[in-house]
Amino acid sequence: MAIDKSKRFLRKTGRKTLVSQNPYHALLVKLYRFLARRTNSKFNKVVLKRLLQTKTNRPPVSISRIANLMKDRKSGKIAVCVGTVVDDERLLDCPKLTVCALRFTETARSRIVKAGGKALSFDQFALVRPRGNNTFLIKGVTKAREVYKHFGRAPGLPGSHARPYVRSEGIKFQRSKTRNP
């Protein structure tokens, strides 16, 4: 007699189709689905998986983070970010970088181009490096969003670092009685 196993924990999770209504995004998924199938490259499979992710799982990456990760030994490589590349005012001089991303903010794009680098879209990148060789995949910090500060052990309990949800910041709203020194 056979045992009927529960498929609940055996099924594969993760998105298989695109949810976004953006036609440009849909074309990119179509392109990378083709490249993942036809080229024997793991890079294209990873890019396809990241293209299908939710917006919260495609966090932004700053120029300073890219510059820091790309310095010295990765000089000839292309930085690839499946997400938005944003500017960082704290980075005083931007090095020459070749970056491929879904989106660039205006200031980030202008700073990369002004430094003598290139800001590529994924369709331009697919023509240059269809197999994704000599590239460096970069991902933003997923848990950097403000909501994550509220998660964890309940606020007020010992060892908790979670922030409480407060309606307002005035004197009447969830303030502990502090001792005046």
Curated annotation (Swiss-Prot):
The gene is rpl18. Keywords: Cytoplasm, Ribonucleoprotein, Ribosomal protein. Its main location: cytoplasm. GO terms for biological process: translation. Belongs to the eukaryotic ribosomal protein eL18 family. This is Large ribosomal subunit protein eL18. It comes from Dictyostelium discoideum. It holds the Pfam family Ribosomal_L18. One of its GO terms (molecular function) is structural constituent of ribosome. Disulfide bonds: none annotated. PANTHER family: 60S RIBOSOMAL PROTEIN L18, LARGE RIBOSOMAL SUBUNIT PROTEIN EL18. SUPFAM superfamilies: Ribosomal proteins L15p and L18e (SSF52080). It is found in: Cytoplasm. It comes from the Eukaryota. GO terms for cellular component: cytosolic large ribosomal subunit.
